From Swiss-Prot:
The lineage of its organism: Eukaryota, Viridiplantae, Streptophyta, Embryophyta, Tracheophyta. It comes from Arabidopsis thaliana (Mouse-ear cress). It comes from the Eukaryota. One of its GO terms (molecular function) is mRNA binding. It is found in: Mitochondrion. Belongs to the PPR family. P subfamily. This is Pentatricopeptide repeat-containing protein At4g35850, mitochondrial. Keywords: Mitochondrion, Repeat, Transit peptide. PPR repeats lie at residues 40-74, 75-109, 110-144, 145-179, 255-289, 290-325. Residues 1-25 form a transit peptide.
Length: 444
């Protein structure tokens, strides 16, 4: 069979793809032929990196299928590229698939690949699976490094498994590995995600920030050459909340990692008093807030419905000749909608106008999130939701099904004629999205 497959080429190869590939059953041979990602190992490596960069992680298995059909023999390096792609896309089953394929070909996973697998477990909030990966490392005599322990600690922290987190800390101590800022960030995350949350959680968070000061200079997670090659920041590898901002040097001071995680946690807890205490600690350290810290402090005030202080922070930042960031506008808009008060919705409306005047535009994810929240307004004129819809429509941006559904239902709850142009457009968009995603009932 293998000989037969390899002997088929040219026009007939697209037919083989149609018969063999996992995802091509509904495609024509011509369409399938166009999906031939590459022809040799070097081109396939480029294709994998390109798919990952485009965040089309769901295509990685297709690329691999195509590679096998071309008879291209995978190497350890390209398997690493595949696993990094699944890590960035949080596709745990695909990550394990590539690991098993490696083993089947006699390629032994190394410590870096195991670190990527553990990180993927963390992204999928599966600490127990991360422990299984770590146990597999020990069975195969793969020596863990500092990154392994920090990946493992943060993977367990995301799912709030305090017992496992402290067991890892003990293992680190026994191995002579010091706790760095990412470890303390993980400890804060673990306590935040533990259910039920203790009453003194805010105090505990402040204690961890204080404790971290004596250890922040210890480097237990030196970046590997492989991390650099794949452009993986430590924040991304360890699933730190600032991962999406780690490459924005004017947005983020990377030496404030523990403060970033602490401010984010206190914002989740809506603890204004503890947030202000943490801000004083930061000032006593002789450091200033970066943009990420400002976002979390704003979020804490706004979600506590202290709109006055939240708005003041925003205005002070904008008048201080600092570089404006889109996230400042969207954080204020989202937070001001908390409780759907008249004052808050007016702030959200005014901020949307300012944002548009400053030529900041909503992207699909942010716009959908804001529309979803704005659509929850039960009273009032629905002005903010309508504005967000119009701003996205003006740039031909289609919101997610969840956002459109919420907006559609909100419009239907109001006394709007069935032939209203807005309602008709939203209804048509809603039905088209449901049809595309297979949730619209078949009317046969």
């Amino acid at each position: 069979m293998k000989f037969l497959m390899q002997s088929i080429s040219g026009r007939n190869r697209s037919l083989v793809r149609a018969l063999v590939s996992r995802r091509y059953f509904a495609s024509s041979p011509e369409e399938i032929a166009k999906r031939n990602y590459a022809n040799d190992l070097s081109e396939y490596n480029t294709a994998v990196n390109s798919v990952t960069a485009q965040r089309r992680h769901y295509l990685l298995r297709d690329v691999y299928d195509d590679m096998k059909l071309d008879g291209v023999q995978p190497t350890a390096d390209i398997f690493h590229s595949f696993v990094v792609g699944t890590m960035k896309g949080a596709r745990l089953s695909d990550a394990f698939f590539f690991r098993e394929e490696m083993k089947a070909m006699g390629i032994a996973p190394d410590v870096n690949l195991y670190n990527f697998l553990i990180s993927t477990c963390g992204k999928c909030k599966n600490g127990k699976e991360a422990i299984r990966v770590y146990d597999e490392m020990k069975r195969y005599d793969v020596k863990p490094n500092g990154q392994t322990f920090v990946c493992l600690l943060n993977a367990c922290a995301v799912s709030g498994q305090l017992d496992l987190v402290y067991a890892i800390v003990r293992d680190m101590t026994a191995a002579g590995v010091g706790l760095n800022q990412f470890c303390y960030a993980g400890l804060i995350t673990a306590h935040l995600n533990k259910q039920p949350r203790p009453d003194n959680l805010s105090t505990k968070i402040l204690e961890f920030v204080e404790q971290s000061k004596g250890w922040s200079a210890i480097d237990s997670s030196r970046k590997s050459a492989e991390d650099v090659m794949f452009s993986i920041s430590e924040e991304e590898l360890y699933n730190i909340p600032t991962a999406d901002y780690s490459h924005r040097t004017r947005f983020l001071q990377r030496n404030l990692t523990v403060y970033h995680v602490a401010f984010s946690a206190l914002a989740d807890l809506k603890d204004v008093k503890a947030t202000e205490a943490l801000l004083e600690m930061l000032k006593k350290d002789g450091k200033d807030t970066d943009t990420y810290c400002m976002l979390q402090i704003m979020r804490c005030y706004l979600h506590s419905q202290d709109f006055e202080n939240g708005l003041k922070l925003f205005q002070d930042y904008m008048s201080a000749d600092k570089i404006p960031a889109m996230e400042l506008y969207t954080t204020l808009i989202e937070g001001a909608m908390t409780g759907y008060t008249d004052n808050g919705m007016k702030i959200a409306q005014d901020t949307l106008i300012q944002m548009n005047e400053r030529n900041f535009f909503l992207d699909p994810r942010t716009g959908s999130n804001l529309l979803l929240k704005a659509a929850g307004e039960k009273t009032g004129g629905y002005t903010v939701a309508n504005m967000i819809w119009d701003l996205m429509l003006a740039r031909n941006i289609l919101p997610t099904l969840a956002a459109v559904e919420a907006y559609y239902k909100g419009l239907k709850e109001r006394e709007i004629p069935e032939d209203d142009p807005r309602l008709m457009l939203v209804t048509r968009t809603y039905n088209n999205l449901r049809l595309r995603e297979g949730t619209l009932p078949n009317r046969r």
